[in-house]
């Protein structure tokens, strides 16, 4: 509640924070029926997953666009960000990383398939990470209907250790 009051009072132009914290703040605003008088220009959540449903809900509550940024602490942050036009797709930043979605044998999966995320860093010349296994699970994508030519990933599902693998090999997230 105190943070919600500060947001109302300061009317920030932009909010950047941990996704779960942003979801919590949005839920407090929604539950208490608080109206945002001056919405921020946009919100970016990072550090954990914002699913497309979260993006839409937070956007509705704050009355502004909401984006999810994906990256790795080990590599300095941003690897991909939600498309401003298609919330179900994330654009990879090709100047910074190569992002691959691979199967258990480290073979790239086809679009629409789920796999582990590997990142290759393109900016650290002293000690680069090459095909670094982030421990994250994502869904491969073959592009975005927005028309931008950036490589894409459809969705970040979460951490590999947050899943259950059945005896038949099926994974539950």
Identify the role of each PLM range:
Residues 1-173:
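Active-site glycine/GP-rich loop and adjacent strand/helix microenvironment
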């Amino acid at each position: 509640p105190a943070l919600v009051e500060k947001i109302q009072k300061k009317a920030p132009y932009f909010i950047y924070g941990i996704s779960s914290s942003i979801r919590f703040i949005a839920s407090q605003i929604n539950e208490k029926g608080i109206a945002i008088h001056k919405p921020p220009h946009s919100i970016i959540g990072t550090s954990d997953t914002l699913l497309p449903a979260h993006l839409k809900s937070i956007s509705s509550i704050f009355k502004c666009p909401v984006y999810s940024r994906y990256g790795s602490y080990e590599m300095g942050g941003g690897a991909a960000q939600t498309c401003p036009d298609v919330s179900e797709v994330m654009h990879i930043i090709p100047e910074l990383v190569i992002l691959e979605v691979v199967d258990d044998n480290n073979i790239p999966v086809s679009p629409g398939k789920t796999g582990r995320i590997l990142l290759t860093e393109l900016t650290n010349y002293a000690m680069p990470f090459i095909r670094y296994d982030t421990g994250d699970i994502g869904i491969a994508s073959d592009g975005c209907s927005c028309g931008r030519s950036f490589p894409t990933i459809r969705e970040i599902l979460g951490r590999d250790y947050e899943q259950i693998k059945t005896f038949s090999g099926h994974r539950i997230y």
